Amino acid sequence: MNNLADTVVVDPGFGGGDKQQQAGPAPQDASVVVPPPATKQSSALKKTSRYRSRSLSASSTDSFSSASYTGSSEDGDDVPPREKVQKNSKGSSDFCVRNIGAQHAFGRREIEIAEQEMPGIIALKKRAAEDKPLKDAKIVGCTHINAQTAVLIETLVELGASVRWAACNIYSTQNEVAAALAESGIPIFAWRGETEEDFWWCIDRCVNAENWQPNMILDDGGDATHLMLKKYPTMFKLVKGIVEESVTGVHRLYQLSKAGKLTVPAMNVNDSVTKTKFDNLYSCKESILDSLKRSTDVMFGGKQVVVCGYGDVGKGCAQALKGQGCIVYITEIDPICALQASMDGFRVVKLNEVIRNVDIVVTATGNKNVVVREHMDKMKSGCIVCNMGHSNTEIDVNGLRTPDLTWEKVRSQVDHIIWPEGKYIILLAEGRLVNLSCSSIPSFAVSITSATQALALIELFNAPPGRYKSDVYLLPKKMDEYVASLHLPTFDAHLTELSDEQAKYMGLNKAGPFKPNYYRY
């Protein structure tokens, strides 16, 4: 393997396939209804004209539309952020956001609202702020930019870190939150609707800054790690540790380790118990319904749905949809997960067996080409297709960018793909993360993950030389338990304490950890 691209999954944040993005039609202003041309419409256009007219004209006030969530994220400012000269109230221009002046106050309120539902990360900030465990840490962050991650970013700063931040997804940034962070003095380079060039430029501005050299990476998808290793290998060797929170990013790290190219220790947060059992499961259980409802106003009762993948994300999606009265099918490659799905009451099928009849397709695998053009050719008209995995490669969107198909944007993050005979499918967020592109995610679940990320950064940064080698590690069990304990007061939950006799009988320390590393919760 001669180059990094051979050893990693292709760009999960932006995706190599997005190089053809300009082939699609230009987005229409959501507040304007464009009169139809005086030509004969296809049957699909006739069937959906009423839906499109309502969504185009009313999306700004519709309580379930994505516009109602993004707020000022869709501000209609056509001037590219990189061409603007902006300064915050302190005179700093070390940032690049959509519009700091018009949005930062609203973004600050969003962050304050999120803090109320994030007790764990706030408790950690209060307990550790005086000790400054991240003093002298210089962290490059590449994650989703929303109110919840803003709470994490400001917590890291409060714990002593210097940070620079970019987005890991071109559609998930809340512009008003990015503006609020910029106003508070945090160097942030992110806005909703970045191009591919913008995406990599933003990460580069974070990594390669004047008089500032990163020594830690907090990644979601592996893009900051990928760029730094490929473009700044000497700088990469000076990094003390990497913290990665996504399936795709962890996969890339293991590939680098296997190829002998991972020269720094990395912490796999994605497979920590507090991430998989709470964020992946409970967060996805709520956000999949919110995403579909906001973007399509779909009625769930009686709908046939296929969920591709029955890991923790797939489990959450399937259980939520089943609870709303959907008939849910599961596709799986793993016999253990397939058996779990079967015993949970779901029918496990191959995608081709049900693709002609289902109303909704949800991917949650972290793999590529799970739903390809052949499948979409067989879908019935009006089928909704969306992705809950990290990567934008699960749905073969490039296979839909052909001359015989027509793309029509009907809402922010909602496209109709129309076949010559009039059939159409509804593609959400162009195959990217639907819950972060079309809705929001529960702040409480993100608090658990954020506290886990913060502790992982503290552990790697303060670890004595030799404790961690150039490999990928799981978060120590003791830290998982500590993160959980930070959130128990919210429920007025009281833990039972072991007696000395009980602790001796079980061979445990009374303060934990209480389960071995191989225990499956």
Curated annotation (Swiss-Prot):
NAD(+) binds at residues 246-248, 311-316, 332, 388-390, 435, 515-519. Transmembrane segments: none annotated. Its cofactor is NAD(+). SUPFAM superfamilies: Formate/glycerate dehydrogenase catalytic domain-like, NAD(P)-binding Rossmann-fold domains. Binds 1 NAD(+) per subunit. Residues 1-92 are annotated as: Disordered. GO terms for biological process: one-carbon metabolic process; S-adenosylmethionine cycle. GO terms for cellular component: cytosol. Disruption phenotype: RNAi-mediated knockdown results in extended lifespan with increased fecundity and suppression of age-related decreased climbing activity and intestinal integrity. Does not affect oxidative stress resistance. Decreases levels of S-adenosyl-homocysteine and homocysteine. Suppresses histone H3K4 trimethylation. RNAi-mediated knockdown in neurons results in extended life span. RNAi-mediated knockdown in the fat body does not show any phenotype. Simultaneous knockdown of AhcyL2 in intestine results in extended life span. Keywords: NAD, One-carbon metabolism. Residues 54-73 have a biased composition (Low complexity). Substrate binds at D220, E245, K275, D279. It comes from the Eukaryota. Pfam families: AdoHcyase, AdoHcyase_NAD. Might play a role in the regulation of methionine metabolism possibly by binding and inactivating Ahcy. Interacts with Ahcy; the interaction may negatively regulate Ahcy catalytic activity. Belongs to the adenosylhomocysteinase family. This is Adenosylhomocysteinase-like 1. It comes from Drosophila melanogaster. The lineage of its organism: Eukaryota, Metazoa, Ecdysozoa, Arthropoda, Hexapoda.
